[in-house]
Structures are given as C-alpha cells and as structure tokens.
C-alpha cells in the first residue's frame, strides 16, 4: 500500500485563485472562470476549501453553498497527479463536520 500524500485543508483565499482557476480548467469541460471564483469567495453563503501540499500549492479544492438549513456541494476537484490520495475525501469530511455542527438538514 502506498503512502498517502500529506495535505493541509484551509479556507480558500484570494491567494489561491490562480491555482484554483487553473485546476478548474484542467478538471472540467465547462470550468468556472477566475471571476466566478472571486464572486463566490465574496458570497457570505459560500465556503471554499483548498488542500495544500507540502510546498503550499493547491492539490485540490471544494466548495459549499448553504441556503437556509441546506448544504450544496458546488465543486470538488483534485489535480490529476494528486488523485487517489484521499484528498477529496478530506475536503468533503470538513464539509460533513460543518453540516453536522450547524444542523444542516442535508448536504
């Protein structure tokens, strides 16, 4: 069994936008633009996380939109070379913990 890649899960900031926008282009056929990501970062009902590798590069990211007591995962993306390391699972676990702590009806 191979050793899993070490990542830190932190809130996404403006400093991560270029790497996240690049990740969008790599992973999705209709990616969110950098401007769309900026707008979502400013949305009080949205939360975005990034998984940073040991060199503080974005290995993955995920987004959550909360409407009333409902949580909606907007996007989950992991760099192709970083996949199969449990990164998406770690990102989603933070959102699951948030949903439970804030008594969301569903996620």
Go through the PLM ranges and name each one.
Residues 2-3, 11-83, 89-104:
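Acetyl-CoA-dependent GNAT
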């Amino acid at each position: 069994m191979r050793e899993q890649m070490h990542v830190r899960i932190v809130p996404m900031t403006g400093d991560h936008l270029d790497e996240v926008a690049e990740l969008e282009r790599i992973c999705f056929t209709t990616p969110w633009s950098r401007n769309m990501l900026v707008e979502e970062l400013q949305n009080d009902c949205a939360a975005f996380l990034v998984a940073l590798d040991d060199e503080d590069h974005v290995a993955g990211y995920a987004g959550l939109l909360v409407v009333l007591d409902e949580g909606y995962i907007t996007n989950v993306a992991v760099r192709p070379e970083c996949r199969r390391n449990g990164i998406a699972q770690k990102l989603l676990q933070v959102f699951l913990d948030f949903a439970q702590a804030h008594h969301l009806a569903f996620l």
